[in-house]
Amino acid sequence: MQKGIKYAAFIFALILIFSPSATAIDHRELSEGEVGIISQNCSSIKVRLQRVQKDDARNRVFLGSQYETIASKLMLNLNLRLVKNGMASASLAEQQTTFMSERDRFKNDFIGYSQEFENLLNMNCKDEPEKFYRQLEVVRAKRADVDASMQRLKSIISLHYESVTDLRNNL
């Protein structure tokens, strides 16, 4: 059981270290010069956005698999072992439930973000730069939702790590 706890601690630490962060930018009106810049640089803007989309998809796959590993192989297995050994912990079980709910929220937030991002990439920024920018703001807000969910997952992982460490120290 000690080996499993050490493995769980290691995975938790990795997630905390490597979770990417995203931020939203506040809405503002575009000047005529900015509208012109978007129009003139539309193709290079789209190339950069496609790169961001590809990186985000790769990060989503990585984080999704790590979150799944934490939920199913670490939290669930630990709680099952604790119950089997007569040492059930209500706080660890609650953390598992909260983590799984937040993981589902992360998935849904990311799907919404991806859909809005795809809508952005399908827009004509050369002919409709203001509309393109408004959609970019929608994408930023959706990305902020994804980031907030990731931060909540990080907090749950940190709390669970502390609980597992306390459990280990009390054995």
Label every PLM stretch briefly.
Residues 9-17:
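Bacterial N-terminal signal peptides
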Residues 92-146:
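Long, amphipathic, charge-rich alpha-helical segments that form helical bundles/coiled-coils
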Residues 27-68, 122-171:
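C-terminal amphipathic alpha-helix
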Residues 60-103:
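Amphipathic, heptad-repeat alpha-helical segments
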Residues 73, 77, 109-112, 116, ...:
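Amphipathic, soluble alpha-helical interaction motifs
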